[in-house]
Amino acid sequence: MKLQLNFTTDIFSDGDLTNYIKANIGDPWKGTQFEGYVHMGAKQKGVFGEMFVEKIIKSLGHEIAPAPTSTAGHDRIINGIPTEIKFSLATRNKTGGVTRNSCIINHMSKSKDWKRLVFVCINVAVPTNPDDWLMRWFTHDDFCTHLQCTNTLFSSQQGGQKGGNDDYMCSGANVKKLIDEEFVKTLDQF
């Protein structure tokens, strides 16, 4: 089949494709200090999250240093402990806002050398109560133990359990359950 010159014009003529894009690029953080975050790539979001957590950790009086290499199995060393950092803004909902405590914590691995994992879910741009900026942590040992539970809140990603990939995530309603787990701690317990 030969692609006709007007083919690209024809498939866009009814507006469906263009309208779909417009409906899915809304930024619920517009007008806040997080404006534009949703349009960044995964790498840029990761760097931003690490910078954000570093500033929070320093403000709490903890010592923090970068990982020894960019390929280390952790992002920072906090109080001498290799620490993985996961940061997310609350996920967009269908009304143009966000769903509280619904975020994505992904690319967690059993085989990496982190000892603690800090995760942050930003629910509102300017916090008025402690959990508006939800900040929690858990240990690598607790993560590995929880993975063995039949009702684990973490799921395999990129190939699933049958793919044998050591890559896990927690998202949506499972994040809301995760924050209530006994092994998950607040930053004041760091």
Positions of PLM-derived features:
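Nucleic-acid endonuclease domains
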Residues: 1-81, 86-190
